[in-house]
């Protein structure tokens, strides 16, 4: 269940962008062709003390052999518990698990958020 902080973050990110947004951003550390939207940029800049680590993880994982093969649709979901533990999973468009990682601390808001990656573009579900 999303906390108020997570709900507010998602709402503000959605206000910051819209479906069909044409402006995309690139990070030179990511594989060629990987971009992200204004909404994703907002989340990375405003979640907790900043969630650049999350965007970097999704972006750089696009070079991983298992992830690279699924360019049509990827779903990246982050869960954060009350204890501040986190789990990040990647599924293909048919919801088959492709990759997972977890950790014992994050300042990302408690709750759940999902991103789509389609043809190398990382976006919020509302931007799809």
Language-model segment annotations:
Residues 1-99:
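N-terminal "domain-start" segment
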Residues 88-128:
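Short, compact, well-ordered microdomains
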